[in-house]
Amino acid sequence: MSKILVLGYLGLRTNQLDGQTVKTRDLYKLASQEFDDVDLYDTEDFKFKKLSIFKMFWKVITCRTIIYLPAHNNLKSIFPIIFVLSKFFRTNIHYFVVGGWLREFLANLPLHRFMLSHISGIHTETQRLKSELEMCYNFKNVDVFPNFRFFDFQPSRTQSDKLRVVFMARVNKMKGLDWIFNLAEYIALNRLEDKITLSFYGPIHDEDREYFEAELSKYPFAEYNGVLQPSEIHQTLNDYDLMLLPTHYYTEGLPGSIIDAYISGIPVIVTEWKHAREFVDNGICGYIIPFENGEPELIEQVLMLMNNRDVLQELQIGALAKRQVFAPPTIDFILN
């Protein structure tokens, strides 16, 4: 019998890299470092072998503790079965939440609320989500377990006459591509191409590919450099000055790209999504711009940093200090 099962979307077959898969892999690594007997089940297997769901159920009933990281569909459809099995076989479930959407998701799911209130623990990325679950649904089993990264990287800042701006996330309109391309248009119209570069990294969302490639082709100072493997991220970001993430997802949790920026010692400019102020100290390790109609301020802040390298350097120092908050925690509490 396995002591611990990590159950979630790891994306191992296709090497899919996004916030969900990276956090699930990191939790598996963390559990493997702390405990001797750790198994895993990658729910991506459902896409390739439908009958593998029975393999998952077998793993569920033969383990002591589940580290559970479901996305929306898994939580809605599979979790009720896992919950029932856990009660029959006395398995502890620890749900590590990815993102900040759970309160809204549960609004019309009273059965799911009941089940979640009776598992061993719900571990949210943000204090605000913890408070919402307690206040809205009277959950008593919630704590905060922030997103994290493994790192021993030491930045060595390189110098450039240009402000090197980077976007690293899913290449998706909802991550703020439209605002970044509006910035690019401003740069082009004001002939600032010799002062700013824009680089994009990340998997391209199929529905937005045509839009992204068309916009990218307009600006010779903008480039797409593909998908970074986890081992490449920090060394690559080290060659940039500033990260943009003007997300339109209001219920973002803690985007992993922000942690990676801090580890690499570069500040961020983000929209004020629901949890932004828990993770970005405005004016210290980056800037928070309005969630609605924040494009003018995005352009203003980028231009200000282009012209004030002393301010940029102070933000870089603040970003590097902030990274210590996201060092790997311990999870020995799951066996209590």
Q: For the regions a protein language model found, what residue spans apply to each?
A:
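Conserved donor-binding/catalytic core segment of Leloir-type glycosyltransferases
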Residues: 5, 157-175, 179-186, 198-199
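Donor nucleotide-sugar binding/catalytic pocket of nucleotide-sugar-dependent glycosyltransferases
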Residues: 117-154
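Glycosyltransferase donor-sugar binding loop
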Residues: 196-210, 226
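Nucleotide-activated donor-binding/catalytic signature segment of Leloir-type glycosyltransferases, i.e.
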Residues: 210-231
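Acidic donor-binding loop of glycosyltransferase active sites
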Residues: 238-252, 266
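Short hydrophobic beta-strand element within catalytic cores of glycosyltransferases
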Residues: 263, 267-271
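Conserved acidic donor-binding segment of nucleotide-sugar-dependent glycosyltransferases
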Residues: 282-283, 287-294, 304-309
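A short, well-ordered alpha-helix in the C-terminal region of glycosyltransferases
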Residues: 304, 311-325
